[in-house]
Amino acid sequence: MEIEIQTKPFGKMQISEKQILSFPEGLLGFEDYKKFALIEEEEESVFKWLQSVEEVDLAFVVIPPSLFKKEYKPLIPEQELQGIGITDLEDGLMLVIVTVPGEDPALMTANMQGPILINKKTLLGKQFISRNESHSVREKILASAAVEMD
């Protein structure tokens, strides 16, 4: 079934109910908002939008971390993963929130310490905190991608 939502980047749009993800604990810093839609701007784009369906002004640019950091594996205890019904990181869709500075998009960063994991079957999601202290909340995406290509 299609529903209409108001989005920050695209205005009003129709989405499938199957695009609505439930975050029972909200996202870090936004615990009051539990329902989000994962929106693709263009099929070819690696960037997606995680848009709150409850608050039009709450939207995040997200990207799979494997696209620029192949060996990225956050350290998350198995019992925390079970909270969204998965037992292994590979069982979920992993995304990281991207910050794109308006003055220079080449300086965009990703929050590698706070990955989002979504159970693809139940559409339950959670933002975790990686116990790996080498993960940064402001990992430079283009610098990391360049190192990976060397």
Curated annotation (Swiss-Prot):
The keyword Cytoplasm applies. One of its GO terms (biological process) is regulation of translation. Keywords: Bacterial flagellum biogenesis, Chaperone, Cytoplasm, Translation regulation. One of its GO terms (cellular component) is cytoplasm. Its main location: cytoplasm. Transmembrane segments: none annotated. Pfam families: FliW (PF02623). It is found in: Cytoplasm. It comes from the Bacteria. NCBIfam families: PRK13285.1-1. Belongs to the FliW family. PANTHER family: FLAGELLAR ASSEMBLY FACTOR FLIW. Acts as an anti-CsrA protein, binds CsrA and prevents it from repressing translation of its target genes, one of which is flagellin. Binds to flagellin and participates in the assembly of the flagellum. Interacts with translational regulator CsrA and flagellin(s). This is Flagellar assembly factor FliW. It comes from Leptospira borgpetersenii serovar Hardjo-bovis (strain L550).
